[in-house]
């Protein structure tokens, strides 16, 4: 695929280790040839596991290239919405903004689930006396939820940086800037 992209679009796609090993401050940059590079984390969560996956985006010549290790729910949801809603996305920047917006929605849903589970733990603790074993189970559950909450917050911070970068490089049109500001407000509402 890399060779095909190079031949078809004159673009050199980064290797996987180049995508993952960047410092936070080096995740957003513009090449001399006009390519815009963005590395953004996307959260993936199942009942069994949760993790972030770094995705590399390159905007070049009216196209958006993305590199990721695996399929993500946010990409599937974007494709579903684009098929069902004409003009949901009009250009490559809309696609990128919508992916970032969907990631915020996805994160908000997970945060809501965290608070629901923490509420159940609170009711257990406040509702009756507990044995040491039961208290240990509750404490362990709280620690798991707080760990998940911290990773979601870090993911949202990364999304905020990506949107801010897109707005700062003045690449977006007025409507897209409005969408970017709305994404930032949505992130702020989760703090």
Residue map of PLM features:
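Peripheral, non-transmembrane regulatory/ligand-interaction domains of membrane transport proteins
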Residues: 1-185, 189
